[in-house]
Every structure is written in structure tokens, then in C-alpha cells.
Amino acid sequence: MAEDFVIEMLHITKEFPGIKANDDITLQLRKGEVHALLGENGAGKSTLMSVLFGLYQPEEGKILKNGKEVAIRNPNDANALGIGMVHQHFKLVECFSVLDNIILGVEPNKLGFLQKAEARKKVVALSEKYGLRVDPDALISDISVGMQQRVEILKMLYRDNEILIFDEPTAVLTPQEIDELMEIMRGFKKEGKSILFITHKLNEIMAVADRCTVLRKGKYMGTVDIKDTTKEELSRMMVGRDVQLQVDKKPAHPGDVVLDVEDVTIHNDQRKKDSVRDVTFQVHAGEIVCLAGIEGNGQTELVYGLTGLEKLSGGKITLDGKDITRESIRQRSKDGMSHIPEDRHKHGLVLDYSLENNMVLQRYWQPEFQKGGFIQSDKVREYSDKLIAQYDVRSGQGSSTIVRSMSGGNQQKAIIAREIDKDPKLLVAVQPTRGLDVGAIEYIHRQIVAERDKGKAVLLVSLELDEVMNLSDRILVMYEGEIVGEFDPKTTTVQELGLYMAGARKQGKESK
């Protein structure tokens, strides 16, 4: 019956040009439950939640709250109905304090004067009640990613939201912070709050959710009770086939040194400090070395230095015996370096170009694609069609598809196809599965292991500790711009890595 549900989204259809993101989807949320929303990348999960939060208007369908139809035209309407959302990419003002961010838009005032003391009192009370300890006066730019997420949660609680939407909330957290978040969700549930939880991590769904709704290609596949299902069954519902959840990987046989990084330092002029300090390591042919750590600890800057996007302040980089420290990005590519970037939109693709033009971004000047300075479109199309077939890149109009219209998983497949087909000596893969579903993750993991088995050197940068443990032959942990530990995945644990990632331990000091 309708009164059993605090929120009902009935027969929701949402269309974008050329695609039905949500096709007749029904989702019903009970009071006091954690309800997971699972689906492949591009299945329509975030779109559906954006409809509920008032960011999009559906073409068809209706939303009921406590059995009564409601109109949610914008996020203000959603907040007024007690619906709050923590987005995957936080919506915080970095130069504002924690307190200012929490009260932004709902500042208490009396006769036109801001009542900041009153707001502080409420924020402190909420943070103590829910175990979300924060410093109200700290600037957002000075606090950790895990702490920023607490601020986002407090924003919802400050607005007295009873229906809480979490969009991929654990993507940037340490194992210890993930455990804390799960405990916070359980606390909300005990209080009678209702939680919608978008995630692609099946173990988290099994740990905290009561029910799970599965979407596939914009359609509703079903809702299951977690106590009556398995991870394998959820994967099958999500992708329509059996999925290999563990990476099938033989022992590594490392060869010669391919990448040699010596005492690399990179100075951040904006923050007036070193973002990378005296980093030294090697990657051999036929092995996968993973850089693990919480986001913002120098991994991005180190990769920028390795790939030529950022200049070094000190140190030396050698690729297959050749000093490439001062070489251009194009020359590093010619020397045998491939790069799957962290931000596929900013550094991996030109979103308004066709798929075929994106496939030759690093090769269009080569003789096979141009003649007399003019690009040979038929050769580009032929090459792109080959990669699309070989790497199973799915898109609406094949090679002529504008990349912006493709799902994240297929955008990532296109980048991987382009970078692997260059036959590199070194593959630098930065968060290659971020935000992707189990089907796409399984595919990308297979490709990375296949490169290793062909004798390539692979440097993997990942925030996903399951991925780190499954794929790596060696693990390096970064904290505050330094490598604080090296580990064998066969002899370490996720909990031990978490302590090093949080700066609680450092090899050569506390631990060794």
C-alpha cells in the first residue's frame, strides 16, 4: 500500500537527445531503510536520483511522498520536502569555512542580521549527535576528503532532511572511513531516516543495504531483499550475464627496469609547498605496480610529472634507459609511454569530437593517417572501426558518434583502446575504473593484466583498495607527497594499507 512508502517514483521516464536515460522506472522507498540503487555506468541511476532531487524534470511519471503526489521543480523543492543529496563530486565552496558551507542558502537571520552563533550551536549539536566531528572554523581547502564528506552529510542534517541520497559516497574514502560511513548510515536507519545509496561496490550493498533496485540500460530489472540474494546474482541482474568478480591473474615474471623514477620533487606554487617530495621507485617489464593513497596526497601531481603535464622541481625520470625528464608529452608518447588519465573528460577525450577523431588524437600526424598535411578521413574511419570492434566500444552511431553522448564506461573503453593499441613499453593507468560498473571493470582489469602478461610495465594509480589488492604485483602507498611504504599484496591487508594511507604509519620509522 502507498502508506508503506515514504517515497514512490512511479513510471518515471527521462529522455535526453537520442537516449532514454530512464524508461518507465518505478522505485519505492520505505521509511527507515537503506535502499541501494545498482546498475552499469549509463544505466540511469544518477539521472533517476537527479529527478528525485529536482535537478531534472521527467517526461512521464510521478513522485509521491507519503502517498501524496508532489512536484519537485528544483533542489529547493526537494529540501522543503526533506530530501537531501550528497553528490559524488562534493558541492562545497573551498574558500569558505565548514560552518559557512553547512548553512549556505539557509542562513539564520534576525531583522536581517546573520545569527552565526545560533547556527554554530546547531552544527556542533548535530556533529556530536551523529559522531560527525568537524571543526566549524576550518576552511574546506584545508580539510581531508573524508572530512569534506562529513560536511556534506551535515548540510543535509542541518536542513532537517529525512530522505538522504548518497551518490557513490565511498569513492574517495580510506577503509576506516568507509567503515565509519556504514556505521553512520546504520545510525540514520535506527532513527527512522530513509537512505537511497547509489554504488557499484557489491560488498558495500551486502554490508549495509536492506533492499536493492537494479537498473540496466535505463530499464527497471527488479528489486530484491539483500538477505535473499548474493553478489553474483546482483551482478547478473546488472549486466545480464555472469561476471568474474575476481581477477584471473598468474604470478608476475618481472624483467628489466622500464620506468626509473629518482628523487622526483614537484613544487605546488599555488600552495607554496612540495606536492611530491623525493619520490624514488622503479617499474619493471611484466609487472603491475600500484600507487595507492587517499586522493590529494600527490598521486595526481606525480603522474602529471611522469607524463609531461607538469615540470619537475628536482629529480630524474628514465624510460627504458632514456632520460625523458625534459621531454614533451608527444615525445614521451613516441618513446613508448601510454597514459589512461584520471579525468577522462579533461585529459583523455575531446568531448565534442567524433569517436573516430578521438581514436587518433595521438597519431593523426603519422603517415598512415595523413597525406601532404591533410588527414585521410577514410583511413581514420577504418582504424576507428577496427578498435571499436576489437575493444567492444558501444555507441549510437559508431565511429561518427560524438563522444559526449557516450556512457562513461564506453568513453573509458575508447581511451583504453587508443592507448593500448599504441603498443607501449609503459602503461600509466590512473583510476581506470572510477565510477564504472562491474561489467566494465571486469573488462578493463582483463586488458591491464593482458598488457602485463605481454611484458609491458604497468603503473596503476587507484583509490579502490579491492582493485589495488586484486591487480597489483607490488603496492606503493603515498601520503602527503611521499612514498611511506611498499607492500606485497599477498602478505598485506586492506586494514594495514589504510593505516599507511592515513599517515598513522611509515616504513623505516614506526613500522620497520
Model-derived features: where do they sit?
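Glycine-rich phosphate-binding loops of nucleotide-dependent enzymes
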Residues: 2-512
